Amino acid sequence: DLRALCPLTQMMGTSSYTTFANNYYTAASDAGGEAWRMVYWNQGMNLENMINQSEAAENWTLAGIGYAIKAYSWDFLTKVNGEAPMKQAFVPGLLSHEYDYQDAIYDQVRVWAKKAIECLEKEDKTNYGTRISQNDYIYGGDKAKWIKFAYAVIARNLASLTNKNDFKQKY
């Protein structure tokens, strides 16, 4: 996003650029917290509820889109922050969470992306009319594009692991 790109294109000699160059965030900003906010606050239980309600109603397009967004978001979060609370993230009333290791999150991201593809390849029980195409600002409800997106999430996820010693044995 622009918070990361602006220091690269303007004022290269300033101290804020030095902070960015050393730490990959703009000084005095919350750019590093944006991934947490996206996963836990902006999407959070809204995305969980959308997926659960869509699966219960057999509205596979919405469930697939939800899983694809969830996979992408968690992949991004673990790339930026490493370990994060995943399994206990949305347990009601829990005030302290155990962190999950990055490899567990990477594995779960692939599960969610594959689940997105599986859901998007199913026929919906409901005819949405134009509700999805008018409200999906990313791909306009185009299932084929969402499937490609989910495959891209898997590819990005595995690309992060290619230099691991055990990559060929595990994947």
Each language-model region and where it sits:
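Acidic, glycine-rich segments characteristic of secretory precursors and extracytoplasmic regions
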Residues: D1-M11
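Structured, solvent-exposed acidic/aromatic patches
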Residues: M12-Y171
